[in-house]
């Protein structure tokens, strides 16, 4: 992967000294500024690992499709990574998610499948729906 690609920046986030926590504990406490990832979340790391691992194990190849049930930042991370690797992404998402999140996912190339927001115990829950779609 090109060192100037978007995904080459995943994980290259700075450590920042947490001043108040350091002073309270008497030792230096640092936090990783994960919001500097391209998708502004630690979930970018998980998405990159999952996709790279699936490609390495030949569970998917270029042009293939990943199906994910997500209402959060994992979807944005996956959309960024899938776009870089030439993979298609279908995201099953509750229809209660913000318009901004849905538009971001679409602009990153994800196909959205919106479903009613129901409890996990319901067979129509977005996570269970994504499993059904992936199995077909």
What residue ranges belong to the model's regions?
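PLP-dependent amino-acid enzyme catalytic core
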Residues: 1-136
């Amino acid at each position: 992967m090109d060192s100037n690609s978007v995904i080459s920046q995943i994980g290259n986030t700075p450590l920042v000294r947490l001043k108040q926590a350091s002073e309270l504990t008497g030792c230096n406490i640092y936090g990783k500024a994960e919001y500097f990832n391209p998708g502004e979340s630690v979930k970018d790391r998980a998405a990159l690992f999952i996709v790279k691992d699936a490609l390495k194990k030949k569970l998917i190849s270029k042009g293939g499709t990943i199906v994910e049930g997500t209402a959060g930042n994992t979807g944005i991370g996956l959309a960024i990574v899938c776009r870089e690797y030439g993979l298609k992404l279908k995201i099953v998402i509750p229809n209660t998610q913000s318009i901004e999140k849905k538009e971001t996912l679409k602009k990153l190339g994800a196909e959205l499948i919106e479903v009613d927001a129901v409890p996990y115990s319901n067979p129509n829950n977005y996570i269970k729906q994504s499993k059904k779609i992936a199995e077909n």
